[in-house]
């Protein structure tokens, strides 16, 4: 009995201290307080993945721009000459990348709509032609940079030989003027040689009137006179068949014409002849597209580039004079048929040699 009373007393004491109701209430309070501070954590963990990626990318871009700005300021203060070259190189890469995207867009449009090259507008035709030429020049750098550690040698060669290895995007404004003058000096060296070849074939022309006209034209050019359009067009028959047709030109004559077009002359004569045909055909197609567009629609830079491509050193000639010369060229080019393209090829020499101050 005593033992049972003791047990009953202990249970009474513990029961009064911790009642079931108080225990349940305490558990509920803990659960509610846990929900109260745990809800925001669960909301943060369930943010949209797209928002997280967007915020991360924005942060990375901001930090990259800040670091890039500090790097540019450091180069500008401590290495000013290198900074100029670095800036030109980076801008050149951006322009080349923009050209590549535009060329791809044009090619995609041609493929979708089954458009041929000669059916394109003038600016798109010229862009593809120039981009193809730039890629061909860059291809050499890509090949020589393939061996391990050769890229260091490539950078050195690019610095030492910018005219030979780099395209126009990576030239300074002064380099552009100087290099264009150098290239024009190269092609002008072949002008007297081409005129002498024309004089040599005069006895082979059967028509006496054509012989006299060609002799008179060569004499005018040698004396420094700029020929008239009708003087050149009068010789169309001469350049459509023997001895001045594209397929009848002598090997040395073809090499001289290749140099006048700034094409390599160190290829077998059949390949040189094929390249000249292709190059002249492209220029003829460009001329037709330009005549349709109108010279007045071109910017000053586009006019000068078009004149330089066709043999005129436009870097030292005013815009109005360049437009006048380009109009003369188009008048001759658009009057020629495909069989008479040899005359258009020789027109690079005939029409540009004595125009204004180009004879030096």
From Swiss-Prot:
Residues 1-110 are annotated as: Required and sufficient for mitochondrial import. Residues 159-360 are mitochondrial intermembrane. It is a single-pass membrane protein. It comes from the Eukaryota. GO terms for biological process: ATP biosynthetic process; gene expression; inflammatory response; mitochondrial calcium ion homeostasis; mitochondrion organization; non-canonical NF-kappaB signal transduction; phagocytosis; positive regulation of cold-induced thermogenesis. Residues 186-360 form the Letm1 RBD domain. Kidney, liver, skeletal muscle, heart and brain. Overexpressed in various tumors including leukemia, lymphoma, and carcinomas of the breast, kidney, ovary, stomach, colon and uterine cervix. GO terms for molecular function: molecular adaptor activity; ribosome binding. Residues 1-137 are cytoplasmic. It is found in: Mitochondrion outer membrane; Nucleus; Mitochondrion inner membrane. Its main location: mitochondrion. The chain crosses the membrane at residues 138-158. GO terms for cellular component: mitochondrial inner membrane; mitochondrial outer membrane; mitochondrion; nucleolus; nucleoplasm; nucleus. InterPro entries: LETM1-like_RBD, LETM1/MDM38-like. Interacts with BRI3BP. Interacts (via C-terminal) with SMARCA4; the interaction regulates transcriptional expression of thermogenic genes in brown adipose tissue. Plays an essential role for mitochondrial structure and function, as well as thermogenesis of brown adipocytes. In brown adipose tissue also localizes in the nucleus where it interacts with the chromatin remodeler SMARCA4 to regulate thermogenic genes expression, such as UCP1. May regulate phagocytosis and inflammatory responses to lipopolysaccharide in macrophages. Involved in tumorigenesis and may function as a negative regulator of the p53/TP53. This is LETM1 domain-containing protein 1. The lineage of its organism: Eukaryota, Metazoa, Chordata, Craniata, Vertebrata. The gene is LETMD1.
